[in-house]
């Protein structure tokens, strides 16, 4: 099985992501606003691979985590208004043609199966950049990386096998 990042609100499973969960200071995030590094303050990843594009590419500049590796990665975006010498500045492609420098205040590996509690605050939780929901400062948000996600298909291998078996050959008699 692949990895998933489960998101719990007040102890109940609310949703999950296959790659990334981003927390934004905004109370509502339009579909493209999650790429605004001035609003994102914390990111949780199931994987962080150097060739990726998106929030996971930032994580890959800190520590590489593949699908085969145990656990995930958590990082915090530094406060742009109050940078510190300890912040780590990385250059990463977060969207095609968008390669900002991003200051990271901290990061750590996340072990499989350990729920991490987030400080209560108003924020928007964005999942894989596809869907989002808001939480209030009265709700407890927790995240956990697990290895019980959906099966993964190797697309390149699948297409290679199909081509070798002639499945794309439309000539008569095949």
Predicted regions and their residues:
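Short hydrophobic-aromatic micro-motifs
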Residues: 15-24, 53, 75, 90-91, ...
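ATP/nucleoside-binding phosphotransfer catalytic cores, i.e., glycine-rich phosphate-binding loops
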Residues: 81-174
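Catalytic core of DAGKc-family lipid kinases
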Residues: 1-69
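Glycine-rich, charged/polar anion/phosphate-binding loops
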Residues: 3-8, 31, 35-37, 75-77, ...
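Active-site beta-loop-alpha substructure in enzyme catalytic cores
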Residues: 52-96
